[in-house]
Amino acid sequence: MSGCEEEAGDGYSSAEDEDYVPSGAEYSEEDESELLREEEEEAAGPRPTRSRNSPRQATRRKKKKRRGLVLEVDEKEEGKAQENEDEEDDLKQSEKDREEEEKKKEDALWASFLSDVGQKPKAAATQATHADKAGEVKSVNKLQGKPKESEKPKDSGRVTITKVFDFAGEEVRVTKEVDSSSKEAKSFLKQQEKWQSSAPGSLPTVSGVKRPSGISSLLGKIGSKKQKMSTLEKSKLDWENFKEEEGIVEELAIHNRGKDGYIERKAFLERVDHRQFEIERDIRLSRMKP
């Protein structure tokens, strides 16, 4: 009895017991079944009290104590795991907050840079899109306006004149457009009216034979009376045709209007001759006076 009392006393050490199980060790199936049975008995009702120092009660106390130690160890491990998870969450949150602060700083720097420059990328992009749309609208309007200009009647301000010449037995046709108010156009129109009026009003027509009329008849009359063309006129005509084919009419006109152009030199010499003539005339008039 004295041995049992010593084991149940306050100086009892579980490490000295033969049935001692270290903390964290698993229970055997027998221990678990016995513990469950004890819990059921305690829940069923009070049992007759036995001696506190009985060996059965001592073993029960040992097992309960071991179970309490295991539960404490599990709770400590769970608490440590929870603390580790909380620390990881805090680290992630702090990193996220730091990234947001850096992003805000970058945005502030970029906004200050744009305010110093005085331009905003979005505004510039919108202006570019508006400019592109305006250019497209203008180009469409131009394309729509060009056909209207081409639809104007040809005889509103220009007259096409076709002349037939005879150069060394060869028929040469010259076609050009002139203003309707020019002398050449007026004379051509008068001549055309004269030929139309001189044509017989009523000639007997034969069935199946069509009488030539309009421009074809006029060209036939012009062809019957071909004008002679000189070599100088033929060379001038060839030169004009060559300029039109090569597309150098405007370039030659600009060059001739320059200081080194032939026309400008010719005009300068004419002005000098005219000025010299005026000086000589003034001298003669001054001598003739008494």
From Swiss-Prot:
Q: Where is the composition biased (Low complexity)?
A: 120-129, 213-222
Question: By its UniProt entry, which Pfam families does this protein fall under?
Answer: BCNT
- Compositionally biased, Basic and acidic residues: which spans? 91-108, 146-157, 175-193
GO CC annotation: what is one? kinetochore
In this chain, the stretch annotated as Disordered covers 1-159, 175-230
Record flagged with keyword Nucleotide-binding: no
The record's section on InterPro entries has: BCNT-C, Swc5/CFDP1/2
Query: Has UniProt tagged this entry with the keyword GTP-binding?
Result: no
Localisation: Chromosome, Centromere, Kinetochore
Q: Which UniProt keywords apply?
A: Centromere, Chromosome, Developmental protein, Kinetochore
Report residue spans for region: Hydrophilic.
159-208
Query: What ranges does the record list as Acidic residues composition bias?
Result: 1-20, 27-43
Q: What is its main location?
A: nucleus
- State the Gene Ontology BP annotations: chromatin remodeling
Q: What does this protein do?
A: May play a role during embryogenesis.
Q: What is this protein called?
A: Craniofacial development protein 1
Phylogenetic classification of the source organism: Eukaryota, Metazoa, Chordata, Craniata, Vertebrata
